[in-house]
Amino acid sequence: MSSCGLRRLELSVAEPELSVDFFAGVLGWTVIAESGGSFSGWVGDRLVAGVVAGEQGWRVFFGGDEPRELKVNSSVDAGRVLHGPWAPAPRAGEPCWVELMTAEPDDEYWVAELGWEVRPGVEDFVLFASSRHGDPRPVAGRLTTDRASGWQVYLAVDDLEAACARVSELDGRVLLEPTTVPTGRIASIEGPHGGACVLLEQPKGWGGTWAVS
């Protein structure tokens, strides 16, 4: 059956404790120490991400019926979808969108693996949509680009300027200053120990503007 959203994220970095403290400082996560030197970040009763030691990068866990590995640093995890178009609206600090960045699109793979439909977006961008619970709703995006590869993670914030100021206070970097794109008003940031991601201001739902387009 079609995957209708995320179970969770996972961030691999060289310094998990320092990295999760950074994101907690910017996004207000509640941090729980897990076994093996890993950590988890929560907003209320919803898990946002695990932070573990390893080669730097984000891993995306989609909800589904059969746990399995997928390509491009992603997996299917059995259980209730916590973040997606049919889940509760994203709160500050929570995932609110994901985009696959790739120079070699393979939309047929994701359609076959996750039961998605491909819908046109803009230029080199398409939407992957799920009809699992009714009319199709966007679950993820795909951007054709040779500038980056892998899953780009979006996290919700209430005040983009304040969040960027906090990034700088905590020795992170603002890679892209606040600007408006089709998804909404965003900034790109990176912590002092890695974990580049996008902040999206006050998304109206999963996918920001895509949720209401």
PLM feature segments, named:
Residues 5-15, 38-47, 52-103, 119-135, 141-144, 170-213, ...:
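Vicinal oxygen chelate
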Residues 1-3, 7-48, 100-135, 162:
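Core segments of cupin and vicinal oxygen chelate
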Residues 37, 53-54, 180, 202:
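Residue-level structural signal for beta-strand termini and adjacent loop
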